[in-house]
Amino acid sequence: MKSRYLLFFLPLIVAKYTSAATMQPFHSPEESVNSQFYLPPPPGNDDPAFRYDKEAYFKGYAIKGSPRWKQAAEDADISVENIARIFSPVVGAKINPKDTPETWNMLQNLLKMGGYYATASAKKYYMRTRPFVLFNHSTCRPEDENTLRKDGSYPSGHTAYSTLLALVLSQARPERAQELARRGWEFGQSRVICGAHWQSDVDAGRYVGAVEFARLQTIPAFQKSLAKVREELNDKNNLLSKEERPELNY
């Protein structure tokens, strides 16, 4: 008898905790706004703006080994587990597949939309050389370097993602908007400190994230998911206590 009940309920249990992982993206890569069309070209070697890029790079390289450098290394990891760890205290609520499955799925979906789809056309078109390659330096996360060498630097996908994520989470938890905006900004700036991107890559990434945010507002599936995220992140059982949500230095 028990085995029959188990066979009946097991698919339902599995479905509950795997539905987030199998949910489809909100739109296809082809339906993204074409970043190669709307972004200006990255600064050339003779452009005065490139001097600013180099200054920003060396400013970041000068603090190698510092706590801020180590934060940049942590920010470089865009696995859903790490992003949840970083943004959970900022949003002031749990983010995990058990308690907040829709939010967990949203983190992964926004990475596809903002970090990959929205930046792809400009990255492929310009294939800009990354600063650590030009200067033959190491980044804050050496294990990523072989992949980064083959991926265009402009615009920054990490930055587009963090900008988009901060904006969407602010829709769900508007009372945490200033903290989310600040952490999203820091996350993008980490790419310059890490040596993976030029400042102009990060600046462009912020705009790409904002454009993708506007694109998602027109999609019913996103709005439906956002409503569930809002419900999860405002559930009293998922809110973090002051002890679990340390005060941020903002």
UniProtKB/Swiss-Prot annotation:
Could you give a GO molecular-function term held by this entry?
A: acid phosphatase activity
So which residues are the signal peptide here? 1-20
The entry's localization annotation reads: Periplasm
Please give the CDD domains that the UniProt record associates with this protein.
PAP2_acid_phosphatase (cd03397)
InterPro entries in the record, alphabetically?
A: Acid_Pase_classA_bac, Acid_Pase_classA_bac_CS, P_Acid_Pase_2/haloperoxi_sf, P_Acid_Pase_2/haloperoxidase
SUPFAM superfamilies from the xrefs? Answer: Acid phosphatase/Vanadium-dependent haloperoxidase
Keyword vocabulary terms for this entry: Hydrolase, Periplasm, Signal
Q: Its quaternary structure? A: Homodimer.
In the record, the note on similarity to other proteins reads: Belongs to the class A bacterial acid phosphatase family.
Protein name, as recorded: Non-specific acid phosphatase
Natural source organism: Salmonella typhi
Gene assigned in the entry: phoN
